[in-house]
Amino acid sequence: MINYSERSAKGHLMVVFHERCLTPYYTSTVECPARVKTIYSKLQDRFPVVRPTPAELNDIQRVHSPEMVARVRAEGYDTYETALTAVGSAVMASEEAVRGYPAFALVRPPGHHAGPEDYRGFCFFNNIAVAIAALIANGVIASVLVIDLDLHNGDGTENIFLGNPAVRVVNISADTRSAYLNSLAQALSKAGNFDLLAVSAGFDTYVHDWGGTLITEDYQAIGNMLRTVAQQACQSRCFAVLEGGYYLPDLGENVLAFCEGLAGR
């Protein structure tokens, strides 16, 4: 891992990663350790990397019921501990963001399909929602814009923050490259001001993945768009958390392109 002080030498964006996310817990074969391994191989020499600690139970229970937490624990030690570590990564990335530094949480399992009472879609705990809820509960921020870039709507995130005026969740979707980028641009132009920009960064919209839409260069453009809006609206307070993305040959390059855009390269 790279020392925290090396940030300026290796890039403005911080990557948060823990090797526990490589654990082969029981899940779908497409949501495999090779996903984060190939991404890490592309990011490790381009950005500083920090190692998180697992999330605390009280943070998890701000957004998930005790009964749901118990069900995740019953999935087995590897699943539960890896899920806690993924949440801890998102929490650390969000803490970087409120200091004005962009951060990317390289995690598995993903989280945006995990709601208050249930979980599905390869998700167990809602990584990004726990991080946001902790910042709000501690009085660090008062308003958040969540942009979900994944092919599938972040229904868990929507359900967690349903009726909460402090958090606005926007899912981006379209059938073509130009329509997708235009949809994102329009959503950002209408967003107004907020204290933090949080991004559920899914890459299954890729042309060779399930979504069959975007190319690698588009992810850099998306990162740039998000960085620009964060600079204008919330003093560069922006973090992203990995969600989907399953086409292994190009997944690392796609995430690298996104991170370079978010870092302003």
Question: Which positions does each model-derived feature cover?
Answer:
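A general "terminal functional-core" signal
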Residues: 2-12, 16, 45, 67-265
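N-terminal low-complexity, Ser/Thr- and acidic-residue-enriched intrinsically disordered segments
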Residues: 2-61
